[in-house]
């Protein structure tokens, strides 16, 4: 039976959570006091929101944590029924633990409709004596103000390179295989601070027995950031035919969408040494053509036009 590494290496205690010292210290103070407010965990995917919620529950309830923890995903059941049924059924049963409350963890809470959130706000008030809510979301701004005002908001950030690579080395050592710096750099670039994605990529590459950057990009369906830099550079310097060939390779051989490529270009251009005005115009163009594609424009037509725009920027703007 294959162990899923993201579960195998999920933090079991708050001290095991990496890269979120301020948030962890705040949660430890709640544990020490034996009480908990409603919480909002806000941040991108893979930043440890679910793992932190589980570690917090284990700290509070010990071996009985599963009896006192309900995890639901709002994106699976977006309507108001999730509030009336699953949550109310769990909340109305009085807890048997000494703290006197249970925890409901609602993942992707920003996917709930406003109507469902309003119903949830009433449920929070009705069952506060027995239930605490932890809302996990990408954007706290999508949680209605009446819920936000009843919660402590903790913001989770993508893991920095040093912390991620330290954890990946620890996993590699435990799994008894070697991984070099270049491969770790490739995993970090692909995951962009998402620890869950990084661990999944490393497990996938370890299973192939071929641990090297090129294989990492291949198995993850990603390409090296330098390819995006080359695409921008070729276009900017007027080598339109070469840029078009590279674009076709990305679209056909790598199977990337136009929006994938635009977002890769956006990430790549941030630290490029390009004249400020040129960089400004390119960023505006990236936003414009991403919008065009999102509204139904053809990937091929719009991406060709984007390269032409960047070529124009290179020739006319200094």
UniProtKB/Swiss-Prot annotation:
Pfam families: AAA, RCF1-5-like_lid, Rep_fac_C. The keyword Glycosyltransferase does not apply. ATP binds at residues 43-50. Keywords: ATP-binding, DNA replication, Nucleotide-binding. It comes from the Archaea. GO terms for cellular component: DNA replication factor C complex. Transmembrane segments: none annotated. GO terms for molecular function: ATP binding; ATP hydrolysis activity; DNA binding; DNA clamp loader activity. GO terms for biological process: DNA repair; DNA-templated DNA replication. SMART domains: AAA (SM00382). The keyword Transcription does not apply. Belongs to the activator 1 small subunits family. RfcS subfamily. Part of the RFC clamp loader complex which loads the PCNA sliding clamp onto DNA. Heteromultimer composed of small subunits (RfcS) and large subunits (RfcL). This is Replication factor C small subunit. It comes from Picrophilus torridus (strain ATCC 700027 / DSM 9790 / JCM 10055 / NBRC 100828 / KAW 2/3). The lineage of its organism: Archaea, Methanobacteriati, Thermoplasmatota, Thermoplasmata, Thermoplasmatales.
């Amino acid at each position: 039976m294959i162990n899923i590494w993201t579960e195998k290496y999920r933090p079991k205690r708050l001290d095991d959570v990496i890269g979120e010292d301020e948030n962890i210290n705040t949660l430890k103070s709640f544990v020490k006091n034996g009480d908990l407010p409603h919480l909002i965990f806000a941040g991108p995917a893979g930043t440890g929101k679910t793992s932190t919620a589980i570690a917090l529950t284990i700290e509070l309830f010990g071996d009985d944590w599963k009896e006192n923890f309900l995890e639901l995903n709002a994106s699976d059941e977006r309507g108001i029924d999730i509030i009336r049924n699953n949550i109310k059924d769990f909340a109305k049963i009085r807890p048997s633990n000494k703290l006197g409350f249970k925890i409901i963890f609602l993942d992707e809470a920003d996917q709930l409709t406003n109507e469902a959130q309003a119903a949830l706000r009433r449920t929070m008030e009705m069952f506060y004596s027995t239930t605490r809510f932890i809302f996990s979301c990408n954007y706290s701004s999508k949680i209605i103000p009446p819920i936000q005002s009843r919660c402590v908001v903790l913001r989770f950030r993508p893991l920095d390179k040093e912390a991620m690579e330290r954890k990946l080395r620890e996993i590699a050592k435990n799994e008894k295989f070697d991984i070099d710096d270049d491969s770790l750099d490739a995993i970090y670039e692909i995951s962009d601070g998402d620890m869950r994605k990084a661990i999944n990529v490393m497990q996938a590459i370890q299973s192939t027995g071929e641990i090297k950057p090129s294989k990492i990009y291949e198995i993850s369906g990603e390409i090296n950031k330098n390819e995006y830099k080359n695409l921008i550079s070729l276009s900017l310097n007027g080598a339109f035919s070469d840029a078009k060939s590279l674009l076709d390779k990305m679209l056909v051989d790598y199977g990337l969408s136009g929006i994938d490529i635009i977002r890769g270009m956006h990430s790549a251009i941030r630290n490029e040494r390009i004249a400020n005005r040129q960089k400004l115009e390119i960023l505006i163009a990236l936003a414009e053509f991403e919008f065009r594609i999102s509204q139904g424009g053809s990937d091929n037509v719009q991406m060709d036009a984007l390269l032409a725009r960047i070529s124009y920027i290179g020739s006319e703007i200094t």
